Amino acid sequence: MLFEIDKKPISAFAAIDDSGGRLTYGELVELGKTLSASLPKRELVFCLCENKVGSLAGFVALYDNKDVCLLINAAIDRELLDNLRETYHPSYFWMPENKMADFGFEAILKYKDYVLCKTGDKAPEMHPELSLLMTTSGTTGSPKLVRHKYGNVENNARNVAKAFGWTPDERGIIDLPMQYTMGLNVICSHLQAGATVLLVAANLMNPKYWQFIKEQKGTNFTGVPFSYEILNRLRFFRMDLPYLTTMAEGGGKLSDTLFSAFANYAEEKGKRFFATFGTTETTARLAYLSPEKAAQKTGSIGKAIPEGNLYLVDENGNKINEPNVEGELIYEGPNVTMGYATSIEDLTKGDEFCGVYHTGDIAKMDEDGCFYIVGRMKRFLKLFGLRVSLDQSERIISEHYNIECACTGDDSKMRIYITKEELKDEVKKLISEKTGLISTLFEVNCIEAIPRFESGKINYKQLN
């Protein structure tokens, strides 16, 4: 089975969630057998994900049955979900039971608070190596997906578990969504180690969050930069968390101030702080900074994970060997995915990346071979650690209101430019609803005209 789950102690807990759900490794094995008897292989399944044991169990069983899952936020905007369904024609949904009435599908299997439903669509033709689909936009519901092949999830889980030194005694705190590549990686690397995943739906500001992780004696935490900003506001350094031994950060660039603060805290308290870096296209993590170097190498993403290789190239594609010279960051490894899909026909495509991924990030390497991200070449932001496409956001706003729109920003805020003052509040509300992110992450500005080049393309430099 996936992650050799059938070899784990059957009574050991694979996952516990903050709503009272519990899942043992033995129950995971049994669900796999039940699902295999109920469902043909190579079906396309939309998994509407929540941080609950039923959601996790279904994904593992479906993956092990060689069905292809697309992981989606269960709270996704219905219009965006319908768009994805019309594009890819899933034959099944794995979804919370309380959402069944919204769709009218036929339920063929119930497990805990989740159900497997038949949509009535025939499974599309798919490449035999296609194992998993994940969204690239993270939040905007773009039909552009990342195509994973068999071995991607398994290799990354194994190598991350090795890099972090996970053992069956770990109790990993997971408040990141499982449909987010980093959240899924944290789950999978713990299952690989035979450890326990603590699934948290409550956010860091909720007292229930802290009550749960204290009761369950959580041993490690993974967060995006915004998570660490909240921890700092909550006076985390004064908290009594004796069981917490490891903290990891990824999903965006942490400020140097917070990086140093948490690295120094870990060093002083005998804990470990891991800075990591990854992308959906590399099945999450591709680099990590050894915790013993964290206090000395502020802002570094470290080196490649086991079995991976990182290097820089210049604008002509030539490899850069000298330290402190900027270039595009390139990664090679068994966790590099197959490529993208934007249509149902793309699901039949083979491996287009061939084990090499051009990240689109500008980086530099120091004398010790540790890498530092300098900036991005692509037009996307990471808000709360979730990738948001500026181009897709522009399309959503322009199409909804039939207006001109331009989006820019950085990882702290998206800046939206329109030409109608009366729509400012409505635009902010719309993009907040479509992305599922709080409205304070969006700034809407009214300008006289959207600046453009002679070619008609938007001149973003005039907006920044």
Positions of the model-derived regions?
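Conserved AMP-binding/adenylate-forming
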Residues: 34-75, 175-177, 387
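Conserved ATP-binding/catalytic segment of the ANL
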Residues: 324, 328-391, 399
